[in-house]
Amino acid sequence: MQDNSSHSRESASAGDDPLGIDKLTVDYDYLLYKIRDYVQSIQLDTTELCKKQNEVMVNGIIENTIDKNIAKFKELLEKCDTLENHYEMLNQLAIITDTFKERIAEAVNNYNXLKKGASKSK
């Protein structure tokens, strides 16, 4: 009997693993390592992708907001230009009415002068 127990000790110390449990343990540990490494790789890729997507969204939102603001400012500038044109028209009307008053007064004076001249001729 002692021969059997000493034989099993010698087999174990020699690395003889008839069921392959040691190899299975190493393979299992290696598989866990690969899975963990793969998950970390996916995590890093996902994190990087999410950061890039966030930047795109933030920049896109900012760009859209800026574009909308620029469009609104252009509309305001167009309205200001239109308003300025209306004021120019008012100024032109003021000039026309001022000169119109002068021309009417001159026409009335000329008419009166012609009327006086016609009265003297009779």
UniProtKB/Swiss-Prot annotation:
GO terms for biological process: endosome organization. It is found in: Cytoplasm. Residues 1-10 have a biased composition (Basic and acidic residues). Residues 63-95 form a coiled coil. The keyword Transferase does not apply. Residues 1-21 are annotated as: Disordered. Its main location: cytoplasm. GO terms for cellular component: BLOC-1 complex; cytoplasm. Keywords: Coiled coil, Cytoplasm, Transport. Component of the biogenesis of lysosome-related organelles complex-1 (BLOC-1) composed of at least BLI1, BLS1, CNL1, KXD1, SNN1 and VAB2. Component of the biogenesis of lysosome-related organelles complex-1 (BLOC-1), a complex that is involved in endosomal cargo sorting. Belongs to the BLOC1S4 family. This is Biogenesis of lysosome-related organelles complex 1 subunit CNL1. The gene is CLN1.
